[in-house]
Amino acid sequence: MNINIVTIGKLKEKYLKQGIEEYTKRLSAYAKIDIIELPDEKAPENLSDQDMKIIKDKEGDRILSKISPDAHVIALAIEGKMKTSEELADTIDKLATYGKSKVTFVIGGSLGLSDTVMKRADEKLSFSKMTFPHQLMRLILVEQIYRAFRINRGEPYHK
């Protein structure tokens, strides 16, 4: 399986980079994983609703340009469906079973995802009703993908 994580913004924190590198290394035994970082749009100090829409649309266009037409797209969004680790594992297992070898997870910038990205998403996933920094979300997502593969293989880790 090929898994892409398309995300807005550059990761700066060393501890997050190290955590993500560790989990992507572990994941290499199960799947090919690529993290595609796209630049965030510079925002003016006092954002109007129109400014926010313009920024999200520009970031959304960048995101959509990196998504393969045949990819199953999972957008991370606070209004998405919450799943347990086992349910995420089941989702990944079913995608593999039904021949969906390309899965793309999308993490938006600080303003969220554009309407066009949300429409392109095959499903929307929420990790919590709380808001997390999008940089931290990368680490949480990669760990959960790793956990899902371990669960699907019946390997110890997830308890």
Swiss-Prot record:
Enzyme class of the recorded protein, top EC level: transferase
Major location category of this protein: cytoplasm
Sorted UniProt keywords: Cytoplasm, Methyltransferase, rRNA processing, S-adenosyl-L-methionine, Transferase
GO molecular function, one term: rRNA (pseudouridine-N3-)-methyltransferase activity
Transmembrane domains' residue ranges: none
Subcellular location(s) of the protein: Cytoplasm
CDD domains registered for this protein in UniProt: RlmH-like
Entry EC no(s): 2.1.1.177
Entry GO CC: cytoplasm
Catalytically driven reaction(s): pseudouridine(1915) in 23S rRNA + S-adenosyl-L-methionine = N(3)-methylpseudouridine(1915) in 23S rRNA + S-adenosyl-L-homocysteine + H(+)
UniProt: S-adenosyl-L-methionine binding residues: L76, G108, F127, S128, K129, M130, T131, F132
Disulfide bonds: none
Entry's family note: Belongs to the RNA methyltransferase RlmH family.
NCBIfam families (UniProt xref): PRK00103.1-3, tRNA_RlmH_YbeA
Chain's role: Specifically methylates the pseudouridine at position 1915 (m3Psi1915) in 23S rRNA.
Subunit structure of this chain's protein: Homodimer.
Protein name per the record: Ribosomal RNA large subunit methyltransferase H
Gene: rlmH
